[in-house]
Amino acid sequence: MNSQIKNKAVYWGTGRRKTSVARVRLIPGNGLIKINGRAGDDYLNFNPLHLNSIKAPLQTLGLENSYDMYVNVFGGGLTGQADAIKQGAARALCELSPDNRKPLKTEGHLSRDPRAKERRKYGLKKARKAPQFSKR
């Protein structure tokens, strides 16, 4: 894994999910997570699902205590933001070393989830909800 690691101090990755966009910066450190200037667990309301989602790419490679993660994220809700951060972290780890790509890809951390809110259509109340039908 360490065969092609570059001697660069900062690794960037961008992740997206629904309407959330996250710019993730990985710096060699001891596992600190800062999201929009706040502690990661505080920003995500101490939700273990979101916290594990964010740490998943680093845990896949066994680097959870080797890099600090500084994140700038906007748009969407907490779940969308957490998944955007996960993808951004995975892309930053691919920039760190090309050997990291295969394990991250098999775990699904690099794939963009295409599901988004469906647009509302005219004649309907919501995207698919139709007004009540009356025969007479």
UniProtKB/Swiss-Prot annotation:
SUPFAM superfamilies: Ribosomal protein S5 domain 2-like (SSF54211). GO terms for cellular component: cytosolic small ribosomal subunit. One of its GO terms (biological process) is translation. Residues 98-116 have a biased composition (Basic and acidic residues). Keywords: Ribonucleoprotein, Ribosomal protein. Residues 97-136 are annotated as: Disordered. Residues 117-136 have a biased composition (Basic residues). InterPro entries: Ribosomal_Su5_D2-typ_SF (IPR020568), Ribosomal_uS9 (IPR000754), Ribosomal_uS9_bac/plastid (IPR023035), Ribosomal_uS9_CS (IPR020574), Ribsml_uS5_D2-typ_fold_subgr (IPR014721). The keyword Phosphoprotein does not apply. One of its GO terms (molecular function) is structural constituent of ribosome. Belongs to the universal ribosomal protein uS9 family. This is Small ribosomal subunit protein uS9. It comes from Prochlorococcus marinus (strain MIT 9301).
